[in-house]
Amino acid sequence: MSSIGTGYDLSVTTFSPDGRVFQVEYATKAVDNSGTVVGIKCKDGIVLGVEKLVTSKMMLEGSNRRIHSVHWHSGLAVAGLAADGRQIVSRAKSEAASYEKVYGEPISVKELADRVASYVHLCTLYWWLRPFGCGVILGGYDRDGPQLYMIEPSGVSYKYFGAALGKGRQAAKTEIEKLKLSELTCREGIVEVAKIIYGVHDEAKDKAFELELSWICDESNRQHQKVPADLLEQAKVAAQAALEEMDAD
């Protein structure tokens, strides 16, 4: 890509002759090389899942989290550069707190997604900034019910029934499309997300990984929370069993 973009990839404010912004494309590459992130909208809430690649055997379990709470009713999962993701989380928390202070009510998921997307896009407009090397899947529960958005490094934001980022995004999207999300509960969704992440993990190329899961549903009192340890373990067992069954076939 560098040979094609020579002279046009030095600044995010420079377009190539064919209308491309190479700095944004490079940022997207950072997302594509990350562990897989999946988000689905079930009939009673949202489930977020992350394939958090373990870079060292010395790393403590649970460190370097990829799923973060933004407000009591919303959370986001990060694919790409973790440090860039933390900056977006910080901004999202600030926007949520500011909105509630001014208007006296929790920020809607759509408004939060729009504000975060505008902030991400801002970093593609000025030469002294660089695009964020991460993408996020934002989920929440507001007066309109469960909502799911994906924000890309370019600042583009779309609403989804199911979304995926990272290395296994294409395979994950294919599996998500097979699910009847309108009939799926979050308890069932946890297992399905675990199966997808275990299924797209490439043991030959990738390191070991840690499964992160969170949900926002009636069972969690419509608050963004980590999936309880017992349900997480059940999901892992079901996913591993499905993977072994697939290998046996």
Swiss-Prot record:
Pfam families: Proteasome, Proteasome_A_N. The keyword Cytoplasm applies. SMART domains: Proteasome_A_N. The keyword Methyltransferase does not apply. Keywords: Cytoplasm, Nucleus, Proteasome. Transmembrane segments: none annotated. GO terms for biological process: proteasome-mediated ubiquitin-dependent protein catabolic process. It comes from the Eukaryota. One of its GO terms (cellular component) is nucleus. It is found in: Cytoplasm; Nucleus. The 26S proteasome consists of a 20S proteasome core and two 19S regulatory subunits. The 20S proteasome core is composed of 28 subunits that are arranged in four stacked rings, resulting in a barrel-shaped structure. The two end rings are each formed by seven alpha subunits, and the two central rings are each formed by seven beta subunits. The catalytic chamber with the active sites is on the inside of the barrel. The proteasome is a multicatalytic proteinase complex which is characterized by its ability to cleave peptides with Arg, Phe, Tyr, Leu, and Glu adjacent to the leaving group at neutral or slightly basic pH. The proteasome has an ATP-dependent proteolytic activity. Belongs to the peptidase T1A family. This is Proteasome subunit alpha type-3. The lineage of its organism: Eukaryota, Viridiplantae, Streptophyta, Embryophyta, Tracheophyta. The gene is PAG1.
